[in-house]
């Protein structure tokens, strides 16, 4: 077997590699690493979104459905339910960020109507300042 040198990103995310019996607990560092591991752009903004959407991981949507971003099914309007919070991170990419084509990310979130709150971007910026 040939040994391939690890990239810096792989080295940084090794400590959250998943196995069948071990999934990382939800902490700010683990969430940030999982966001990066999934190739999500603007990881600090996305981290701030998760904190804001869940009220620092206390919301019922997070506790009952492991949904960090308040993602809803456009057909039913119901919140997506995940088996583990890491699935919610992947879903953020596959349901939201894949549409991003460049430019100011916060303005893009506003343009696509990511949140119902007209002051959502200001709230995200406030969380970002505290990180």
Q: Predicted segment positions?
A:
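Catalytic cores of secreted/periplasmic lytic hydrolases that degrade extracellular macromolecules
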Residues: 1-131
């Amino acid at each position: 077997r040939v040994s391939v040198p690890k990239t810096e990103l792989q080295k940084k995310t090794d400590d959250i590699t998943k196995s069948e019996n071990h999934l990382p607990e939800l902490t700010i560092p683990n969430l940030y690493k999982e966001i990066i591991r999934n190739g999500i752009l603007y990881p600090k903004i996305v981290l701030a979104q998760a904190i804001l959407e869940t009220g620092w991981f206390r919301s019922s949507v997070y506790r009952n459905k492991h949904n960090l971003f308040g993602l809803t099914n456009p057909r039913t309007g119901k919140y997506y339910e995940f088996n583990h919070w890491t699935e919610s991170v992947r879903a953020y990419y596959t349901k939201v960020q894949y549409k991003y084509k460049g430019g100011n990310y916060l303005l893009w979130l506003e343009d696509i109507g990511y949140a119902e709150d007209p002051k959502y971007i200001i709230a995200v910026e406030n969380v970002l300042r505290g990180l």
